[in-house]
Amino acid sequence: MIPAAVKDALTNNYASYVRPFLWYSGENKELLAREIRAIAASGAKEFVFENRGGDWFGTDFWWDIFGFTLDYAKSLNLRVWSIDDSHVNTGSANDSLHKEENAQYRAVNLRLDMVDAAGPLTGGAFSLPGHTENEKIVQISAFRRDLDSGNSYGEALDLTDCVQDGLLVADIPDGVWRIYYVMTTDPERHGLFGKYITMMSKDSCRHLINETHEKMYEHFADYFGNTFAGFFSDEPAFGNCDGQYGPNAYNLRLGMIDKMFPWWHDFPQRLAEKCNSTPEDVMKKLPALWDSVDEVSASLRLAYMDLVTELWQKNFSEQLGKWCEEHNVEYIGHNLEDADAHMRTGWGCGHYFRSMKGQHMSGMDIVFEQLTPGISTVDHAMNTASRTRSSTFYHYTLPKLAASLAHITPHMKNRALSEIFGATGWTCGLTNMYSLFNHTLICGINNYVPHAYAIPVPQVFESHQDRENAAGSVTPPGYCLTYLPPTFHAGGYNPQYKVFCDIIKYVQRVCHITSTAQHKPDLAVYYCAESDWMNCGSYRSMDDVSMKLIRSGYDFEFLPLETILNEAAAVNGKLAVNNEQYKALILPMSEIIPEALLKKIAEFADSNIKVFFTDALPVRTENGAVDASLLKNIHVLPWATLTTELAAAVSHDFAVAPAQNDLRHYAFTDQNGTDGVMLFNSSLKPIEFTLPGRNHLVYDPWANKLYRLNGNTLQLTAQKIVVVYNDLAQSDLELYPTLPEKYSELDLDYNIFVRSATEKEFKLLRGNSKAVNLNIAEKLTRFCGEFRYESTFECNNANMTTLIIPNAGDAAELFVNGISCGTAFGPYCIFNIKGALKNGINTLQINTFDSPAYADRKGDKNIGWGSGFPLRAHGFTGSIMLG
């Protein structure tokens, strides 16, 4: 029996899972239509219209262009989404907050200044800290300081009413005191975010809807729910930062004295309710958000972050989601997740799960060179201002966050979306695209927004006709027709576009299988945002835990606090949420955890749920020392021995022998109750292992073929995904291809033909030549095109099944005796040539495809971000192997 989803995939009969961005920067309708046709040719069935570089949103020009887009898409049976603001980041409300009439919707933030004083001091005064006319001091408090720890402590003095004539006129008792000045911030301190909406106000978020969503509906109501699919939020933010996207953009936590934090006029009352206190008491203790105040900081910070993330969820995400539902469309998008921004303010969203609760799909992005195949356990350098990034976060944590949110949120229908490729540059060619897709597919991502299609033709390819075709395009003063590589079609000049379209179809096949199935994880892992919020002790990074578990052969999902408290249940010795079940709950070590969490996990442990902390047990909650009786059935997994001790306590549902650190798996049950597992070799070398079970059916989604396994041993080549079903193989299926033990080296001479990206015909570049480095031999360091290698060789064993090009560039397509053997990804291209060889003379044709990386470099219209990946070779070099 072939599973139904696999049957669909074999015939490319799948739903829509890929919706690329279409970057629009003022081009005319003819060029816009050309790019929409290119999207349709890729196999994508929808796209996201992304406004870039123009101030025309909401003008007659915009309505005309977007109306044309909808009509043309409809004629091609495509659906259209739209970014939900005039530009990235979502929240400018079409730049309407620059108008003073909308000033009431602008964000309010607080900052801190302070001075230390040794008392007693009587009859004197203190100068107020410098502040602009747009800043107002809202609270002045003083705390004693502990001269051993440096922390503040004790009862606060409220000095707010002691200001006279620009001075703080107050007596200070005996001891060392720290005087804190809490004030609103000048919007000028926040750069672009100074004129943005605030998630702290329902009315402010509604203003965004009024300026974008309602106006779109007014003009295009007839398209809503059919051709028009919905809205995409792109990196909305709290905005309590300087608005500069630099190396310190994400490092914004409570407990950092120099930072600014969101505020609103009703916060004193709201915080008082959460703290079981009074507004006056909350204001007096407010400096504990910034500085360490014993017995105050943890509880106040927890309450504060609980409040601001709750407001984001209700005011922004759920309000937008509800509006979309009421208008028969859907709401998708993602926030800025990098470097723990997903649980912090500033550029971040404070709480990954809450921030997208109103969306109809979870969201994330992999852009720049954030995820580099082959580098997964150490930080890696990037060609951006932040210089280095955490490989572990992008490989092991971020995609699992997105999949987890989709799986535990019923209205998301298991749909986890990732924007992908943005700003990775032309060096992100076919091989990297294939790998990046696979690294996220294996985590459960099943919807994608590839970034991007862009209409401008790179100048190096641009012809006189292209310039004439661009006539009528419109750009406001100070703007230009720009693009951000990779732009997949590149006006028809990208030699890789044909294979890119094949990749899109491949991704849709894999997404179809996982989208129609129920995930079967081993474990649940606590999403420890609260530990980061309180910032009152050490804790084990979720990234460390993610990497350790995955490389130990476990699959898992993250659960946030409110899910653990309100939705998780003990069912037959397992933890259950929605349709997911987990054999154990793992909590990253934290010195301090929320008291409500401690009580709940103790309840689970008493119900025979296995509950573990990594490293050590917590020592306190926001309310004081831990009640030791609550920990009696909770266990510790020492970090050094976590893998072995966890394996002794919790069995793997799926395990291979020998264990493979680089093998990733995603187990599932399909709609008919058939169990399957998706496997991914995340390394850059082939791996071999023995599968559990027998009579395995293997689906190769790239080749789009079914195989049976010879015994239980499976070989997976580098960066490859297969889907395996136990006990379903049919005897008439071809055996899954394996790598031969021995190879013959073929050091052939080739006729090497070339076609540049701007030419239609191939011409001979080198005759009777070895496969040499063309950058050196032909000085092709500014070239982009296709290469065709033609040769012949003699064979006396037509039963050989494998041809390998060990030193290929981005990708290669192989024909043996005119028979297509498919396309493989570099640099180590492996082809199944079974049945293509014959005894005697054989013909060989190898086609390769450049990305525009060598030719179209930074400058001109190319914004030029993302050049961190290596430029891959033209064609290939050296011998090939036959076995």
What are these regions (language model features)?
Residues 2-4, 8, 12-24, 28-34, ...:
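Carbohydrate-binding surfaces of carbohydrate-active enzymes
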Residues 49-165, 170-171, 179-206, 221:
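Acidic/aromatic-lined carbohydrate-recognition and catalytic surfaces
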Residues 186-188, 730-731, 849-857:
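Short acidic/polar inter-strand loop motif in beta-rich domains
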Residues 204-230:
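An active-site-proximal structural segment forming one wall of the substrate-binding cleft
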Residues 721-723, 801, 839-856:
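Short, well-structured beta-strand segments enriched in hydrophobic/aromatic residues
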Residues 793-795, 799-817, 824, 844-848:
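Aromatic-lined ligand-binding clefts that engage carbohydrates, nucleic acids, or primary amines
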Residues 794-795, 829-841, 852:
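Short, surface-exposed tryptophan/glycine-enriched loops
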Residues 856-883:
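Exposed low-complexity, polar/acidic, P/S/T/G-rich flexible segments that act as propeptides
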